[in-house]
Amino acid sequence: MNAKMALAVAAGGALGALFRFYLSGLLPVYRDFPVGTLMVNGLASFILGYLYGLLFWGFDVPSDWRAFLGTGFCGGLSTFSTFSYETFSLLREREYIMAGLNVAANVFVTISLVFIGFLLARR
């Protein structure tokens, strides 16, 4: 990895993390359900699906932009560790149905949004 690529990943990661912090603060919890985390994970999944859809369908995305958006921004925006912690917290509080819904919603929403982003990139 060269310095330009490292800077692209670092800048994207910083912006993604700041955006996550902002968005998560808008809707952190709704009736014990961590909506903010679901939102940021869904948005990152959509962007990543769109980016890799562009690549798959033949659009030339420079490698430094792929690093900035994919690894950097989407990596900083999404948060598997917070999702895991929030699910664990729901289990610890004996909110078993909410914990299961959190897992199901995150898996379904993120995979669906990757797919939708991928398809929308086709043009």
Curated annotation (Swiss-Prot):
It comes from the Archaea. Its main location: membrane. Na(+) is not transported, but it plays an essential structural role and its presence is essential for fluoride channel function. It is found in: Cell membrane. GO terms for molecular function: fluoride channel activity; metal ion binding. Na(+) binds at residues 75, 78. Keywords: Cell membrane, Ion channel, Ion transport, Membrane, Metal-binding, Sodium, Transmembrane, Transmembrane helix, Transport. It catalyses: fluoride(in) = fluoride(out). The keyword Transmembrane applies. The keyword Membrane applies. InterPro entries: FluC. The chain crosses the membrane at residues 7-27, 39-59, 68-88, 101-121. GO terms for biological process: cellular detoxification of fluoride. It is a multi-pass membrane protein. One of its GO terms (cellular component) is plasma membrane. Belongs to the fluoride channel Fluc/FEX (TC 1.A.43) family. Fluoride-specific ion channel. Important for reducing fluoride concentration in the cell, thus reducing its toxicity. This is Fluoride-specific ion channel FluC. The lineage of its organism: Archaea, Methanobacteriati, Methanobacteriota, Thermococci, Thermococcales. The gene is fluC.
